[in-house]
C-alpha cells in the first residue's frame, strides 16, 4: 500500500510560495513586492490590502500639488499673467494719450495724381477768400438782379410775369400791364390838381368790354392781399409776391378807396 502524499493546504512549502508569487492580483505594479517587504518577507501571509493610489509618488505628485495649491509653478504663471496685464494697460494708456494729443484732421483734397503738401496748403488758404467773394456777390445779386412776379386777371385765361425792377413807379407798371392784357386799357382820371403817389392816382384801369373799373392788388410777404399804391414804390417792390387785377366790386373789404371812387363816378 502506497504511503499517503503530503498536501500543503496552508501554503508553507516553497512550491506554494512560488505559485503565490505568480498569482494574478488587482493593483498597480510593485504594490505586492512592497507589501511583502514591509511584512518582513513572511511568505506572503500578511498581504497588504489592495488599494489604488490617486496620486503617484515622487516629483510628479509634487508638481501637481504645486499647480493646485500655488507652489512655484503656479507662482510663475501668476507672475507672467500679471506682467501681461500691466503691459496691456500701459499700451491702452499710451493710445489714449495719443488720441487726446492728436491734432484735428484737415479737409483732405481728393484727386489723382496725389497733390503735394504745399499745394494742399495753398488750396486751403485760397478757399476762405473765395467764400468771401461768393458771399459778397450773393449779397449784391438781389439789388442788381431781376424780381419776377406773376400777374393774373379776373376772366383772363392766362397768367403773365413782370419784372418789377424794370419800372420806377406805379404808372410805368400800369402801362406795362396794358400791353400784356388787351382786354383793359389805362385812362386818366380826375385828380383835382393833386399828384398821386408815384403817379398811380393819375391813371385808372378800365374794362372796355364791360365798362367796369378794375383794381390792381398784390399779395405781400404775409400772404395778405393789399391795394397797389398805398405804400411807396420801393416798399411795394420789396414786399410784393403776386399781382392780381380784380373788379372794383369784388374788392369791397380790400380796397375801400377804389370802391368809393367807383360809386362817386356812377
From Swiss-Prot:
**Which Pfam families does the UniProt record give?**
AUX_IAA
Domain PB1 positions: 146-248
Induction record: By auxin.
TM regions (residue ranges): none
Keyword Ribosomal protein on entry: no
Q: Which UniProt keywords apply?
A: Auxin signaling pathway, Nucleus, Repressor, Transcription, Transcription regulation
UniProt xrefs under InterPro entries? AUX/IAA_dom (IPR033389), AUX_IAA (IPR003311), PB1-like (IPR053793)
* Gene Ontology BP annotations: auxin-activated signaling pathway; regulation of DNA-templated transcription; response to auxin
Q: Does the keyword Protein biosynthesis apply?
A: no
Q: What protein name is recorded for this chain? A: Auxin-responsive protein IAA21
